[in-house]
């Protein structure tokens, strides 16, 4: 797999990684942008792992930098007929602002388009998450639209922006 930042790599999520994922899941500032309830019990996480380990409509990767776990990338809702999937990423707050999100996103997009032969990746991002939107635009994502009051988080409904990138556009850029 192509590496865009030295020593950054994606590898499949393993059972041994669940403690790291559990720490991210229990960080309210991280989960706010995933529009999910924080404070998931570890047993719930292991049950989800067991349920989805052989699910061909999902791929989950640990982002590593020099053998340190710095985040998680997910390709979910993979549809092999329409050749599309939803992209999701979490960077551990201790590693944010160091370029890992850009590099990991490039690696994940490359995997989706070169290995899975998908045509389109899409995502939804909180409209207030300007850093993420900037990264996605930089990598060739385009804005498809705005979803009004799409998620309830921290006591209020949040608007999100739906963005996508197409295989040919990404391949032409990189």
From Swiss-Prot:
**Site feature Could be important for selectivity toward long polyamines, where:** 86
Stored InterPro entries: Acyl_CoA_acyltransferase, GNAT_dom
Note whether 4Fe-4S occurs among the keywords.
no
Per the record, the pathway is: Amine and polyamine degradation; spermidine degradation; Amine and polyamine degradation; spermine degradation
Localization (cell) = Cytoplasm
UniProt KW Membrane keyword: no
What's one GO MF term for it?
Answer: diamine N-acetyltransferase activity
User: Which residues does the annotation say bind acetyl-CoA?
Assistant: 89-91, 96-102, 129-138
Detail which positions bind spermidine.
36, 44
* UniProt-listed Enzyme Commission number(s): 2.3.1.57
What GO CC terms are in its UniProt record? cytoplasm
The protein's UniProt keywords, in alphabetical order, are: Acyltransferase, Cytoplasm, Magnesium, Metal-binding, Plasmid, Transferase
**Residue stretches making up the N-acetyltransferase domain:** 8-159
Tell me the function of this protein: Involved in the protection against polyamine toxicity by regulating their concentration. Catalyzes the transfer of an acetyl group from acetyl coenzyme A (AcCoA) to the primary amino groups of spermidine to yield N(1)- and N(8)-acetylspermidine. It can also use spermine.
Record note on quaternary structure: Homododecamer.
What is the protein name stated in its UniProt record?
Answer: Spermidine N(1)-acetyltransferase
Q: Which gene encodes it?
A: speG
């Amino acid at each position: 797999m192509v590496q865009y930042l030295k020593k950054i790599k994606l590898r499949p999520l393993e059972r041994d990684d669940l403690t790291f994922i559990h720490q991210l899941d229990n960080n309210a500032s991280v989960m706010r942008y995933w529009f999910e309830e924080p404070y998931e019990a570890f047993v719930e996480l292991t049950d989800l792992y067991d349920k989805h380990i052989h699910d061909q409509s999902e791929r989950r990767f640990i982002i590593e930098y020099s053998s340190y776990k710095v985040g998680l990338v997910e390709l979910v809702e993979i549809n092999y007929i329409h050749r599309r999937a939803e992209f999701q990423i979490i960077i551990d707050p201790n590693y944010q602002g160091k370029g890992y999100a850009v590099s990991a996103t490039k690696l994940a997009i490359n995997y989706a388009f070169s290995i899975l032969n998908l045509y389109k990746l899409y995502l939804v991002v909180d409209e207030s998450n300007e850093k993420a939107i900037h990264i996605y635009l930089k990598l060739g994502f385009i804005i498809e639209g705005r979803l009004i009051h799409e998620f309830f988080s921290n006591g209020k409904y949040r608007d999100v922006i739906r963005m996508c990138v197409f295989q040919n556009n990404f391949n032409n850029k990189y």
